[in-house]
Amino acid sequence: MLADKVKLSAKDILEKEFKTGVRGYRQEDVDKFLDMIIKDYETFHQEIEELQQENLQLKKQLEEASKKQPVQSNTTNFDILKRLSNLEKHVFGSKLYDE
């Protein structure tokens, strides 16, 4: 998936040879810069791998959680309101209607 989109690997960067000209760049500076790029590539590759694994785990957890959710019963809003009213009467008694 990702390998199709990325054109360079850390190994490609490491093994790249540049021709030198009369007034070319200092090879030591280029090597240091390429070393930094290689480290970044390796870090990015590792981070992508970890995120892909985490993504798979989360998808599995979501799938399992959706399977565990109970099927809703045929309780209607009227039933809920009736139960709530009975509970209020039981808890508050006549205080609820006196005020």
From Swiss-Prot:
Keywords: Cell cycle, Cell division, Cell shape, Coiled coil, Cytoplasm. The keyword Coiled coil applies. The keyword Cell division applies. It holds the Pfam family DivIVA. Gene3D superfamilies: 6.10.250.660. One of its GO terms (biological process) is regulation of cell shape. InterPro entries: Cell_cycle_GpsB, DivIVA_domain, DivIVA_fam. GO terms for cellular component: cytoplasm. Forms polymers through the coiled coil domains. Interacts with PBP1, MreC and EzrA. PANTHER family: CELL CYCLE PROTEIN GPSB, CELL DIVISION PROTEIN DIVIVA. Belongs to the GpsB family. This is Cell cycle protein GpsB. It comes from Bacillus velezensis (strain DSM 23117 / BGSC 10A6 / LMG 26770 / FZB42). The gene is gpsB.
